[in-house]
């Protein structure tokens, strides 16, 4: 973390600049920001619960840099907050917000605070977000092993999850409703080899026609499955509990013919599926406190996150995400869509021209040459929840030129789902 001390004049300038940035975004009309209207419940006494996921791309080059920038005033973070304010989810997961025990709290207090909301003078806005959870992740945590086999240790590829410092590419959950922190289950330390039938990466053996393991046994037995972590975050809403199942699997690229990242991405998604399956397939799961077993069969849950796998296009092992999307424990509903995704695909060249999926379902605006725009961010409710509406926050220029420019704060787009939540009667 940087130890540089700013002069009082530099600090005042930074604060004034930050306040100006926030004021500009708050002065944008709801129409300019393309606010997303909330659905109406179909059952008397029920509430509408909006759940979202958003890879905010708020990762930085060095430890502590994000928090330091947030305290000074960060233009990207102000845009991310404005997107969140336009969609106004009750519960949301942020991927790629660096973890250092302070960043999530600073972002909440300085960019999503009730004071800013009061200043906006928009009576249609929902109550403020009060609760958050941010925990340690595997990215940047040195394994002490030569994981990539290049004869060197202590490099980014030798961390339990790729990263240059602990907490890079972290994640956090924010909520208007109470997070039951004492009941959170995390799976940061779960070992890949503990998964039955794990996709162990293999490579050719120059002295044999048979394949050999890319990772030696001594390394394989220690490898952690989660590139960041997997979380089960219980949230108390109207007397009932919603489990937000959060993760951010590794991209299935940046490797070699052994496809070690593709295998890992597949099994990180499989862990989600096994955990919520409601049968013996998740019996092997053990959390960081030593508690074994999957989620209860009668639980209401939402799987959320940048899963880095498109079911149709891209370079991943699509069978895992396809199985997850088709799982009987998940609600059957159309994929969230946007007009901006269609517009972006029509205006781009390269890989998008060869894609087979509906561009309206894309959730990321990536390199036109490769991989092109993809659907890799998901909000997947359990089958015992009624889906009222869903969408990808990606306004077209014709809908709102201002909002279309705003979403460029990240290469991912926020995905949201409206659920009917029937509260317990008092």
Indicate residue ranges for each PLM-predicted region.
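N-terminal secretory signal peptides that target proteins for export/translocation
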Residues: 1-14
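Bacterial N-terminal signal peptides
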Residues: 16-28
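N-terminal, active-site-proximal structural segment of metallo-dependent hydrolase catalytic domains
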Residues: 32-173, 200-224, 238-242, 255-257, ...
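Metal-dependent phosphoester-hydrolase catalytic domains
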Residues: 35-36, 178-186, 190-196, 234-236, ...
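Sequence/structural signature of beta-propeller domains
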Residues: 73-75, 139-140, 162, 204, ...
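Sec-exported extracytoplasmic/periplasmic mature domains
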Residues: 85-89, 97, 102, 106-116, ...
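A surface/extracellular/periplasmic glyco- and lipid-processing/surface-interacting theme
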Residues: 180-242, 281-286
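Glycine-rich, aromatic-lined ligand/substrate-binding cores of catalytic
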Residues: 244, 249-251, 259-265
